[in-house]
Amino acid sequence: YLHILAGLLKPKTGEIEIDKTDIVSLSEKATDKFRGKHIGVVFQKSHFIGALTVLENLEMASWLATGKKHTKRAKKLLEQLGIENQASKLPSQLSIGQQQRVSIARALMNEPKVLLADEPTSSLDDKNAEKVIELLTSLSKEYKAALLIVTHDNRIKEKFINKITLV
C-alpha cells in the first residue's frame, strides 16, 4: 500500500489526492516530479547512488525535485540525525543504521507534504530509534506534513495516538 500512496504503483481503481492533486491521474513523468516535491519516502531497505557521497545523495534528491542542491539543509538534517561526520563517505561505507538515517534525511530534503516511512527504525538501536521518531514527528509538524509509519517496532508503536492496525 505504501508504494501506491507514494505514486510508485497505480491502484486499479480510486483516487489518491495529495495537496489537492489526484496523483493517479498524472502521467508517469508528472507523478515522479510531484513525488519529488511533495512526498518523502523512507523505504525499509535503503537505496542510494553508490558512486556519490552521503551529502551528494541528499543534494541529488533536492536537485532532481527543485533544481537546487540545498547543501545547508542537507548538512542540518545529517546533524539532526547524528551522522554529520559521515557526509563525505560513500553509502557503502556506512553501517545499516547509518544508511537508514541517511534515507530519512533524503526523504525530508524537500519538505514534503506527506512523509511515508516503512520500518524507519528497524535497523536502529534504542537511542537512535528515539532520535529518528522525534525528528520525523517534529519535522512533520513543522512542515505540516502527514506522517504515515508502517512498523512492527514495539518501541515506537505507543508513541502515536492515531493508529491503524492490520492483522
Q: Which sequence ranges carry the predicted segments?
A:
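Conserved ABC transporter NBD signature motif
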Residues: 14-22
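Hydrophobic anchor residue at the start of the ABC signature
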Residues: 104
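Conserved ABC ATPase signature
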Residues: 90-100
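Catalytic Walker B motif of ABC-type/P-loop ATPase nucleotide-binding domains
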Residues: 115-118
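Helix-to-loop junction immediately C-terminal to a conserved catalytic motif
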Residues: 6
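A short, proline-enriched helix->beta-strand linker immediately N-terminal to the Walker B motif
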Residues: 109-113
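Short coil-to-helix segment of the ABC ATPase nucleotide-binding domain corresponding to the Q-loop/switch region
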Residues: 52-59
